Amino acid sequence: MEGTHYPRHFVDFTVFLCQKYGVDRNRLFVEYSSGLPPPLAGPRTGYYEGLLSYREKDGHPEFLITVFKASREPLLTLAHEFAHLVKNLKSGNFDKHLRPPDDSAEKALDEQALNDLAEFQSTE
């Protein structure tokens, strides 16, 4: 069986994000998937480079961030999906349905992701 080969700094960046935002690493699973990413919901063409999934197990929330190998910038995609997680944790809203992207919300998450990645890279 072949193991997963993560992009450089992928695991370290995940740990950094968990520490920065106080996310319990035992409740977060991160997958780097060679599977085909799903197409964008709505009329826009393209595909999701990453996804955030949620479930409850034994009364405790668990989260899965999937970053697809098709992602052009896997660390940035990881940070973007993590930004969704932080937003959901703050709001308490864990909607599981794929919807067409909200451009203004996605832009704010992209900015947070860029800032988080820059902060991480400055500590290397």
Task: Set out the residue ranges of the language-model regions.
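Membrane-integrated ABC transporters
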Residues: R25-G35
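Prokaryotic Sec-type signal peptides and long signal-anchor helices
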Residues: T14-K20, R72, V86, E124
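Zn2+-dependent metallopeptidase catalytic core
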Residues: Y6-N26
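Active-site scaffold of zinc-dependent metalloenzymes
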Residues: S33-R72, L89
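Short active-site segment of divalent metal-dependent hydrolases/proteases
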Residues: A79, A83-K87
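A short, highly charged nucleic-acid-interacting micro-segment common to nuclease
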Residues: M1-H9, D102-E106
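Charge-rich, solvent-exposed alpha-helical interaction surfaces
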Residues: F13-F16, E81, D116
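Post-HEXXH active-site segment of zinc metalloproteases
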Residues: R72, L76, N88-S122
